[in-house]
Curated annotation (Swiss-Prot):
GO terms for molecular function: rRNA binding; structural constituent of ribosome. GO terms for biological process: ribosomal small subunit assembly; translation. SUPFAM superfamilies: Ribosomal protein S19. Belongs to the universal ribosomal protein uS19 family. The keyword Amino-acid biosynthesis does not apply. PROSITE patterns: RIBOSOMAL_S19. Keywords: Ribonucleoprotein, Ribosomal protein, RNA-binding, rRNA-binding. The lineage of its organism: Bacteria, Pseudomonadati, Pseudomonadota, Gammaproteobacteria, Thiotrichales. Pfam families: Ribosomal_S19 (PF00203). The gene is rpsS. The keyword Iron-sulfur does not apply. Protein S19 forms a complex with S13 that binds strongly to the 16S ribosomal RNA. It comes from the Bacteria. This is Small ribosomal subunit protein uS19.
Amino acid sequence: MPRSLKKGPFVDHHLLKKVFEAQESNSKKPIKTWSRRSMIVPDMIGLTIAVHNGQQHVPVLMTEEMVGHKLGEFVVTRNYRGHAADKKAKKK
């Protein structure tokens, strides 16, 4: 179920503070965050935000199409390497 419009978008305060600081200083340095649950707001467009995937921070450039989505949607947390090969099938 989507979030109520009455409540507005959720963005962690510490992330929003870093976004405003980066805009004021025109910094191109990526903003590191662990907040995958934060929604992308129009203030973030053009910034690079490094979102944590459980192991490392993956840089993501914010575009207009991303507004309204959550940061975690753009960084994969699971790495699928395929099923193990069947040893019996290899011998034939």
